[in-house]
């Protein structure tokens, strides 16, 4: 492998693949590093596998296959099973099959995608409790959640991924005992102002409606305004407890799938010192980037859901814009040529971002989900409870690393 490249991309999801295609179309040398064994990221995981294809929306499947095909034919250097563990300036340290390597680049495009919002709750460490994203990965990889399809599965939380997962579970013949909806009613009421913009993207709204109808037709009981969710059991999950309409109730469950939305992966940006911004509605940090994904650090871009969660279609466009701008930055193409190549993607992205603003409120997390009992484990590795963290903050330790030091 070359020790230097024009562009190194981290992440082979829709944004990373599109960025590679865009940069290569301008003649740049490109190396793409990804920890998975095949391209696609989380959204298009195993898209080249017939098993995964069977679970995907036909339009997304065909678009994903075309994107992967374009990437494989682009001439970019593809390094699967690469774990990036260090970055100094624009020099990356990574390992492939436990062999350390280094690679420098004139431009770095981070495309880490999004991650499930971590929300601890009583009993979340019990066997049988999973995140919705992990469950969907298991299904796409040919696994099953339970040995018995009639074993009750409970969904809990808020977010479009739960709609998608519910459809996949129903298609697989899994019995969904209930969906405990934890969404914020007040924020959903605020979404009305953004509804007209959402109408600019009928296919996306149509997809959401189809997923919702699939859940309704599947007879899944939806319990609104569920609070105080707890996983109960001795050695593994046996029941799920929740509060609704002033009463506490229990449901038998073999599996509990919890999900409270997708947020950007900002760990690398944060470690590098790139400027971050706070979203008060979605209650998450995201990188401060311009229209092309440029961060506050020279030569560092963030593309896709790692910049802000707008979904797969928007991620492709963000990746394309970052790849084109990387070529402009190196002087390989003129600003005018960059503008011409980016114009179509900009127009489409503007529509998608406006439409996604509606979902920002519809699937906003309710702050009450973070109000967990003191005995709730927050860090299972160090056995740190919510109460220990609150005690540290009350004693004046307000910086994250300080809290980690005094509670570990």
Residue positions per predicted region:
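Residues forming the flavin
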Residues: 1-407
């Amino acid at each position: 492998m070359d020790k230097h490249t024009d562009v190194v991309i981290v992440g082979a999801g829709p944004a990373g693949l599109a960025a590679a295609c865009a940069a290569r179309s301008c003649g740049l040398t490109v190396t793409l590093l990804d920890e998975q064994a095949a391209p696609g990221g989380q959204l298009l995981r195993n898209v080249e596998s017939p098993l995964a294809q069977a679970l995907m929306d036909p339009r997304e499947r065909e678009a994903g296959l075309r994107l992967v095909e374009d990437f494989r034919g682009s001439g970019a250097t593809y390094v699967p099973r690469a774990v990036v563990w260090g970055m100094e300036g624009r020099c990356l340290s990574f390992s492939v099959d436990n062999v350390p390597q280094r690679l420098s680049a004139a431009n770095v495009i981070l495309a880490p995608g999004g991650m499930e919002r971590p929300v601890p709750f009583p009993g979340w460490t019990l066997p049988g409790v999973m995140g919705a994203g992990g469950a969907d990965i298991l299904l796409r990889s040919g696994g099953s959640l339970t040995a018995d399809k009639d074993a009750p599965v409970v969904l809990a939380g808020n977010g479009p991924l739960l709609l998608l997962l519910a459809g996949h579970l129903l298609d697989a013949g899994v019995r969904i005992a209930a969906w405990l909806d934890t969404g914020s009613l007040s924020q959903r009421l605020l979404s009305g102002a953004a509804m007209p913009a959402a109408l600019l993207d009928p296919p996306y709204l149509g997809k959401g409606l189809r997923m919702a109808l699939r859940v309704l037709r599947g007879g899944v009981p939806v319990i609104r305004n569920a609070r105080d969710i707890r996983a109960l059991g001795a050695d593994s999950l046996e029941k799920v407890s929740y509060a609704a309409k002033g009463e506490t109730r229990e449901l038998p469950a073999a599996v509990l799938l919890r999900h409270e939305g997708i947020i950007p992966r900002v760990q690398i940006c944060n470690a590098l010192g790139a400027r971050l911004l706070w979203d008060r509605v979605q209650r998450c940090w995201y990188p401060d980037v311009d229209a092309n994904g440029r961060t506050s650090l020279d030569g560092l871009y963030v593309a896709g859901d790692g910049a802000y969660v707008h979904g797969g279609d928007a991620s492709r466009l963000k990746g394309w814009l970052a790849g084109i701008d990387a070529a402009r930055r190196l002087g390989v193409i003129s600003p005018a040529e960059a503008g011409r190549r980016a114009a179509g993607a900009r127009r489409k992205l503007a529509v998608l971002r406006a439409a996604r603003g509606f979902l920002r409120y519809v699937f906003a997390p309710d702050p009450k989900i973070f109000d967990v009992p003191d005995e709730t484990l927050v860090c299972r590795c160090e056995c740190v409870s919510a109460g220990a963290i609150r005690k540290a903050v009350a004693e004046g330790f307000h910086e994250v690393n300080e809290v980690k030091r005094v509670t570990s």
